[in-house]
Amino acid sequence: MKPAMETAAEENTEQSQERKGCFECCIKCLGGVPYASLVATILCFSGVALFCGCGHVALAGTVAILEQHFSTNASDHALLSEVIQLMQYVIYGIASFFFLYGIILLAEGFYTTSAVKELHGEFKTTACGRCISGMFVFLTYVLGVAWLGVFGFSAVPVFMFYNIWSTCEVIKSPQTNGTTGVEQICVDIRQYGIIPWNAFPGKICGSALENICNTNEFYMSYHLFIVACAGAGATVIALLIYMMATTYNYAVLKFKSREDCCTKF
């Protein structure tokens, strides 16, 4: 029979080793988390959600403003309405694609991070796995370049609405308010090319323009376009993070797959 103190000491040692084993297991699991891909996924989901949601509503508000104030004849802006409707459907596709693509990239990040850090014993990776990682690197680069174009394109309506808003601020200013020159301050939406030059009225001046700026459609569309542009910028940043993470992981996988590899990055 062992003394009670020795038995208690052995139990405490076993419990300590068990706690230490759980702690080491948790640290090992946390070491396999691809934090860069995780941050990029959250940022990508947020950016795409802002761009798609706000952009969809802002486009609908833009059509309402054009129909009510700048182009009363439906045939003059029929093509623009079809293009905007098509863009709204494209937005649905973008949201669905990036939701799936973000999850796939996050899963690929878990795989490559675990392989790079050799969390599962001896390092093993297949040629197919490296090929898939290389494909994601190429696809992410292509999407990054494409989203730079989307980001630039999303700034165009912000510029247009800002010009209209700044013109309204000039009309509201004390220097011009109440003078006869107010009615000569105009905004011609036809100069942006979104409606033809024969569209009527196409140009709004003075107090009528000020009334447009005071409508809820203009206020909401303007600010939603700003948020959509910011969402596109956030998506570009997320794709840049994806690029760095996937490129690094692919380079390490490619390097460590060589038989003469004897060092680590």
UniProtKB/Swiss-Prot annotation:
Location in the cell reads: Cell membrane
Please name the PROSITE patterns in this protein's record: MYELIN_PLP_1, MYELIN_PLP_2
- Membrane topology label: Multi-pass membrane protein
The transmembrane segments are 31-51, 90-110, 136-156, 224-244
Q: Molecular function terms in GO for this entry?
A: structural constituent of myelin sheath
Q: What is its main location?
A: membrane
Q: Which residues are glycosylated?
A: 73, 177
What Pfam families is this protein classified in? Myelin_PLP (PF01275)
Any one GO cellular component localisation term in the record: plasma membrane
Could you state one GO biological process linked to this protein? Answer: negative regulation of serotonin uptake
Keyword set, alphabetical order? Cell membrane, Developmental protein, Differentiation, Glycoprotein, Membrane, Neurogenesis, Osteogenesis, Phosphoprotein, Protein transport, Transmembrane, Transmembrane helix, Transport
Q: What superkingdom heads the lineage?
A: Eukaryota
User: What tissues express this gene product?
Assistant: Neurons and glia; cerebellar Bergmann glia, in glia within white matter tracts of the cerebellum and cerebrum, and in embryonic dorsal root ganglia.
Q: Which residues carry this modification: Phosphoserine?
A: 257
Quaternary structure per UniProt? Interacts with SERT.
Record family assignment: Belongs to the myelin proteolipid protein family.
Q: What does this protein do?
A: May be involved in neural development. Involved in regulation of osteoblast function and bone formation. Involved in matrix vesicle release by osteoblasts; this function seems to involve maintenance of the actin cytoskeleton. May be involved in cellular trafficking of SERT and thereby in regulation of serotonin uptake.
Name assigned to this protein: Neuronal membrane glycoprotein M6-b
Species annotation: Homo sapiens (Human)
